[in-house]
């Protein structure tokens, strides 16, 4: 989903800002759909090299956008005087914010496993998600309030940030795209029990491109709400498994007996995701709590059933 949205976004940005014919939009989606996966195709070193260039460039764009918006609205007094045309409930707003980063956060270990130490991994994650992602959310919300326009492409056009914005936005989207498809490949290889990472990467790019061609760009808000509902329960299962079942200490990978799938985890996840999706309250929190509680209950039920089976077999002897 994210890959499809990013692919469609950069194609639409180029067509609008460079005044290209509308007929170029779909071919550009195909071009970027497969082009964005090149660094992920190379591997982690490709991701790292691109990020070293793109992150500073995106920081410059964010600062420029904030400064321009502040100037256009007339400073802090002008900003406080703006009355939004539409409103969201607090629960929906929180769900949308969760949706912007929860997918990447849940799969962050795909990158942090390359860190020099666990301390570096933790701090890098905290800085990246809270400061980096937080700054991007603030910038997007700031522009939406000032210009009464939720579309980031239209905001950049209104600010007059044309060519520089195209280059910086392109780099930023590329870092999002290659990390997204890298995660897809890692999960896909694990699911399919294959080491053909590059083939899975291309397959993911193909699916993402099809979704982009199908109109994913228009579905960003519903997609964020969906992500904010169905992804957080995964974290609930992981936390319950780590802190409750394994008491905060997983066995070494070489010594662990890994099942083909965790039936308890899957059942708890489905229950948590369903409750989050249909909940009238803050969906991500509901999903995490329900999934974690369900996993603990199912685990204890399984352990009790196994204990009774052992006792029955012992008595039979």
Question: In which residue ranges do the predicted regions lie?
Answer:
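Hydrophobic transmembrane alpha-helices that form the core helical bundles
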Residues: 1-20, 174-190
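Membrane-water interface regions at transmembrane-helix termini and the short interhelical loops
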Residues: 9-20, 32-54, 110-116, 186, ...
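Hydrophobic alpha-helical segments and their helix-loop junctions in multi-pass secondary transporters
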Residues: 12-15, 24, 40, 56-82, ...
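Transmembrane alpha-helical segments of multi-pass small-molecule transport proteins
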Residues: 17-42, 56-65, 89-105, 130-137, ...
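Membrane-interface loop-to-helix entry segments
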Residues: 27-32, 36-69, 84, 122-129, ...
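Hydrophobic, membrane-embedded alpha-helices of multi-pass small-molecule transporters
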Residues: 68-72, 81-143, 157-178, 259-273
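TM-loop-TM module centered on a large, flexible mid-protein loop between adjacent transmembrane helices
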Residues: 131, 135-177, 181, 188-194, ...
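C-terminal membrane-solvent junction of multi-pass transporters and transport-like membrane proteins
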Residues: 235-317
């Amino acid at each position: 989903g994210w890959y499809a949205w990013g692919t469609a976004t950069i194609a639409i940005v180029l067509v609008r800002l460079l005044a290209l014919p509308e007929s170029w939009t779909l071919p550009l989606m195909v071009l970027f759909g497969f082009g964005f996966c090149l660094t992920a195709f190379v591997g982690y070193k490709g991701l790292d090299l691109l990020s070293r260039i793109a992150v500073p460039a995106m920081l410059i764009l964010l600062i420029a956008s904030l400064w321009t918006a502040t100037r256009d609205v007339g400073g802090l007094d002008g900003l406080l005087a703006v009355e939004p045309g539409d409103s969201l409930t607090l629960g929906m707003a929180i769900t949308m914010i969760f949706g912007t980063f929860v997918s990447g956060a849940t799969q962050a270990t795909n990158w942090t496993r390359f860190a020099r130490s666990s301390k570096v991994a933790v701090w890098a994650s905290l800085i990246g998600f809270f400061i980096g992602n937080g700054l991007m959310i603030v910038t997007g919300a700031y522009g939406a309030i000032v210009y009464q326009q939720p579309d980031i492409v239209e905001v950049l056009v209104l600010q007059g940030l044309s060519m520089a914005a195209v280059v910086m936005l392109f780099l930023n989207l590329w870092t999002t795209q290659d990390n997204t498809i890298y995660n897809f490949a890692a999960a896909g290889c694990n699911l399919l029990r294959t080491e053909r990472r590059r083939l899975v990467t291309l397959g993911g790019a193909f699916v993402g491109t099809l979704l982009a061609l199908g109109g994913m760009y228009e579905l960003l808000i519903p997609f964020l709400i969906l992500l904010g509902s169905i992804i957080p329960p995964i974290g609930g299962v992981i936390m319950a498994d780590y802190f409750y079942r394994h008491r905060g200490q997983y066995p070494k990978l070489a010594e662990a007996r890994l099942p083909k799938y965790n039936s308890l985890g899957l059942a708890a996840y489905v229950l948590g995701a369903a409750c989050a999706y249909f909940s009238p309250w803050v969906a991500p929190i509901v999903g995490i709590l329900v999934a974690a509680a369900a996993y603990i209950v199912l685990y204890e039920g399984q352990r009790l059933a196994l204990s009774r089976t052992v006792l029955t077999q012992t008595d039979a002897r």
